[in-house]
A protein has these predicted regions:
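Charge-rich, low-aromatic oligomerization/scaffolding segments with amphipathic character
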Residues: 137, 289-292, 360, 366-382, ...
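Interdomain boundary/hinge elements
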Residues: 38-41, 152-166, 198-209, 238, ...
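Long insertion/accessory domains within large nucleic-acid-processing enzymes
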Residues: 260, 265-268, 400, 444, ...
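A short, contiguous, amphipathic alpha-helix enriched in charged residues
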Residues: 319-342, 555-561
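Conserved nucleotide-binding/hydrolysis modules and their immediate coupling elements
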Residues: 207-312, 322-324, 485, 494-544, ...
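Conserved nucleotide-binding/hydrolysis micro-motifs of P-loop NTPases
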Residues: 17, 29, 79-80, 103-106, ...
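P-loop NTPase switch module centered on the Walker A-proximal segment
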Residues: 1-100, 104, 144, 213-216
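Canonical P-loop GTPase G-domain recognition
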Residues: 123, 133-193
Length: 607
């Protein structure tokens, strides 16, 4: 049986192509907000980091009513590092809106998520956004999307579906570029016409596949999924089972049932086939579990989540400043927090190491792990992490490494430098197009991209756009240069002085300013030469009774201090270095703090 009063859709798009803004407008025009109600932009990006960076990390659910139809909307992450979120969420919907920027066109992440949607046989509706951009190239972008659909072997009905042209900022949609839209009605109508209604047995034994897990201080774990069969009622007895593990729970009583209405989660006494529901009552409910009636225990297969490609070591901070700034500093705290993350992030892997104070954490990419680090830091955790490393695999007896598809959009003048740098990092140019702005497509090892983003922004004078997505594993490509410059390393512990920094800046770029606490072995800057250099940044100017206006500390000006962001620190550190993370500071340091001990270690390795 088909439920015509409901549609379940996901919006898939590349980072910053405007999907959260489009959802805002759909909510406004669907009557979720009262007239004259004050609203914030990008309501779906509810996390602090999401608002700051303008990216969606966790998939969100909302619902809007159009006529007599309820449209459940899932806003998904656009970055492949959060692909674990995307893959799970697609199991809850019957169709997707493919949202593409009218200038940038389809990007690697668009391809990644679209491929997953087509594998699940979901209906696709193409939406070109930002048609009011002065540099919009709608017709060319439509051609690129159709090429992509053909390349991914989409069926004819998808390719022949009408294309919608939207300005999410203005809240307008049209089927014809020559006829400007006035509201989003054409989009809503297309959703009802081309996205199929949920289908299933409304009278069979109740069954729902849990796709995401939420947590509430009041009711504990909340499982979210789409009901594939039957009816759930608050207080009824159910069990949960898992196809992969084969484990089935004892019967338990359903606690609260919730449905989505606008931006709110509202209590429901009864939910039926086709509804997206949130339910509580089991403390051990996990992603991939099927909640069903005890008289018909039947697990549903769960989507295969892509394996991690990048690993880092998270360890207890053992620097001289350990414990000063963090609330949670012990290995017990660190372990508990990582295990808690595993409950909601299916793409993450955490394992023990030889040391009780260190854990191996594997994720889908640098961004995936850096968001986890930033979240932990804001929650009061203090710890240290190693340089990101790729995860190698042995395939048919051959050591293989992850290869990424890199798409670069850059001014013509910078294209040569980009091609040369990627070539040095073992990348191969696959495709090149464009005149004033050049679009380059490479296949490059994941480790070749570590540390490249800041170099890329320098080469393109901040005008370049780069985006990469995991493609496949291939035999190891050989050595790749990591860092062409050395580090300026603090000689002693103390407080940095303007006098010492004034002379240290001649050696390279400083990362710290005056009056900052430093310790021996801490990295305070970037050397202009390839080797590390030990510098004294705590040196005081000797007081004499001679006047020397030119050497006055007042006349000493620091040329430039470059405070490092989390991503820049992760790109910069080498194998023999760590990044110390506290709620207040990021400090890069040598693993071996004493310069003499480092020299002895180096000589030992040479022998």
């Amino acid at each position: 049986m088909v439920r015509e009063d409901i549609r379940n859709i996901a919006i898939i798009a590349h980072v910053d192509h405007g999907k959260t803004t489009l959802v805002d407008q759909m909510l406004k025009q669907g009557g979720v907000y009262h007239e004259n109600q004050q609203t914030v932009d990008r309501v779906m990006d509810s996390g602090a980091i999401e608002r700051e960076r303008g990216i969606t990390i966790l998939a969100k659910n909302t619902a809007v009513h159009y006529g007599k139809t309820k449209i459940n909307i899932v806003d998904t992450p656009g970055h492949a590092d959060f692909g674990g979120e995307v893959e799970r969420v697609l199991k809850m919907v019957d169709g997707v809106l493919l949202l593409v920027d009218s200038f940038e066109g389809p990007m690697p992440q668009t391809r990644f998520v679209l491929k997953k949607a087509l594998e699940l046989m979901l209906k696709v509706l193409i939406v070109i956004n930002k048609i009011d951009r002065p540099d919009a190239r709608c017709e060319e972008v439509v051609g690129e999307i159709l090429d992509l659909l053909i390349d991914l072997e989409a069926d004819e009905s998808t390719i022949e579906n009408p294309i919608l042209y939207v300005s999410a900022r203005k809240g307008t949609a049209t089927l014809d570029l020559d006829t400007p839209g006035t509201d989003l009605r054409p989009l809503f109508d297309a959703i009802l016409k081309y996205i199929p209604a949920p289908e299933g047995d409304p009278d069979g034994p109740a069954q729902v596949l849990i796709s995401t897990i939420d947590y509430s201080e009041y009711v504990g774990r909340i499982g979210v999924g789409r009901i594939t069969r039957g009816v759930f009622k608050a207080g009824m007895n159910v069990v949960h089972t898992n196809v992969q593990t084969g484990v089935t729970s004892q019967p338990w009583r359903l606690g609260n049932l919730y449905q989505y209405d606008g931006l709110k989660r509202v209590d429901a006494e009864e939910v039926r086939m086709g509804d997206i529901v949130a339910l509580s009552g089991a403390a051990d409910l996990s992603i991939g579990d099927t909640v069903c009636a005890p008289e018909c225990i039947e697990g549903l297969p769960f989507v295969k989540i892509s394996e991690p490609t990048v690993t880092m070591t998270f360890q207890v901070n053992d620097s001289p400043f350990a414990g000063r700034e963090g609330t949670y500093v012990t290995s017990r705290h660190l372990r508990a927090r990582l295990m808690r993350e595993l409950q909601t992030d299916v793409s993450l892997r955490v394992s023990d190491t030889d040391s009780t104070d260190a854990f191996e954490v594997c994720g889908r990419g640098e961004l995936h792990l850096s968001i986890l680090i930033e979240n932990m830091r804001r929650q009061g955790y203090e710890f240290a992490v190693s340089k990101p490393r790729v995860i190698y695999r042995e395939i048919d007896g051959v050591k293989c490494e992850p290869i990424e598809r890199l798409v670069v959009d850059t001014p013509q003048a910078s294209a040569g430098a980009v091609i040369e740098k990627i070539g040095r990092r073992r990348g191969t140019l696959e495709h090149m197009s464009g005149q004033d702005r050049v679009r380059l497509e490479f296949l490059v090892p994941s480790r070749g991209l570590f540390g490249y983003r800041s170099e890329f922004m320098t080469d393109t004078r901040g005008e370049g756009i780069m985006s990469a997505v995991f493609e496949r594993y291939e035999p190891v490509k050989g050595d790749i240069p990591h860092r062409s410059v050395g580090a300026l390393v603090a000689h002693e512990s103390g407080v940095s002085t303007p006098y010492a920094l004034f002379y240290a800046q001649e050696r390279g770029t400083l990362f710290i300013g005056a009056q900052q606490n430093v310790y021996e072995g801490m990295i305070v800057g970037q050397n202009s030469r390839p080797d590390d250099l030990v510098v004294n940044v705590c040196k005081q100017k000797h007081v004499t009774n001679m006047r020397n206006a030119s050497a006055s500390e007042d006349a000493m000006r620091l040329i430039s201090v470059h405070p490092m962001t989390l991503e820049e620190c992760l790109e910069f550190i080498d194998d023999d270095e760590l990044l110390e993370i506290t709620p207040k500071n990021l400090r890069m340091r040598k693993r071996i703090l004493n310069a003499g001990d480092r020299a002895r270690q180096w000589r030992y390795k040479q022998d």
